Amino acid sequence: MAVDSREKGKRGEYQVRDILRERTGLEWERVPGSGAFGQSHGLKGDIYLPPQSGHISKYCFEVKWYKDDNISSNLFNVGESTLEKWWQQCSREGEQMNSKPALIFKKDRGQWLIALDSSDPMVDNLMSRTHMVLNKKDMEIVIGLFEPWLHHASVEDLIK
């Protein structure tokens, strides 16, 4: 049975939204249309805090869910890897929103991972556990497990 990648992406965004809601008690939402709506309403990323929540996220959360383990291909080659392309999108949208980029991604049947810029103070929550650092071209990111990172973050760490 073929999988609709848009539906899969939407399910992933809802999963991450629900994890954020459960941990923070805030009413995080999925950006309607995940991009299409955002283009005309100034929203970037996939998950945000709506104005009626009374809060603004410090992070531009971009969510990716992939099937094949091709994320590491080209990491050490001249070409761009899938991970680098995702990070560029997340960074660009974060800059447009005046927010920090936070890429949340997973492989089928895997755990949610998070990638943060190495200069982000919240990387300390990643560095104290199993993690990896990717330094290539003009990016240096730290990757670790999303849920333990979030568990050790306070609401104040996530909102402006």
From Swiss-Prot:
Disulfide bonds: none annotated. Keywords: Early protein. InterPro entries: D14-like, tRNA_endonuc-like_dom_sf. It comes from the Viruses. The keyword tRNA processing does not apply. It holds the Pfam family PDDEXK_15. GO terms for molecular function: nucleic acid binding. The keyword Lipid biosynthesis does not apply. Induction: Expressed in the early phase of the viral replicative cycle. This is Protein D14. It comes from Escherichia phage T5.
